[in-house]
């Protein structure tokens, strides 16, 4: 599997008529702030842009926000864009590497792009996990430890 490092995130909410840009440190990041300043929104938008749909609803969250995530993958820069259900990967020359409007297709495309190759064994059958498996940590919600986890998309 390739190494993925976030560089920056840009968000545009047409509904709220607001935009935001966040730069990430190349080695470590701590998302810190008071309640209702956007920590969960930023985290959720990162995973949504990459194709995950973490559990839970955020109050007042604009799910039509357009996002552009810049990431370094194995020392090469790529751009990941999400607008509604459409997602795309662009290389550093802003050429389309892959795009789709279907989430199930995106999981396969992104999993292949990242060389994600998790094999799940069940009884006598083996299946390759979709790209959703890369996001297991996004599905583990800290305030829901006692409740059942829903990892159906793996």
What are these regions (language model features)?
Residues 1-78:
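Extreme N-terminal "head/tail" segments of very large remodeling/mechanoenzyme assemblies
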């Amino acid at each position: 599997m390739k190494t993925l490092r976030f560089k920056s995130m840009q968000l545009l909410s047409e509904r709220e008529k607001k935009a935001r840009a966040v730069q990430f440190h190349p080695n470590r990041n701590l998302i810190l702030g008071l309640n209702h300043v956007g920590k969960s929104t930023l985290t959720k938008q990162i995973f949504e842009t990459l194709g995950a749909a973490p559990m839970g609803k955020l109050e007042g969250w604009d799910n039509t926000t357009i996002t552009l995530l810049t990431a370094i993958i194995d020392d090469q820069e790529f751009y990941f864009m999400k607008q509604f259900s459409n997602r795309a990967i662009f290389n550093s020359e802003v050429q389309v590497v892959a795009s789709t409007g279907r989430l199930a297709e995106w999981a396969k495309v992104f999993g292949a792009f990242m060389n994600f190759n998790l094999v799940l064994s069940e009884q006598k059958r083996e299946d390759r996990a979709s790209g959703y498996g890369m996001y297991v940590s996004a599905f583990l919600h800290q305030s829901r430890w006692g409740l059942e986890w829903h990892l159906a998309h793996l």
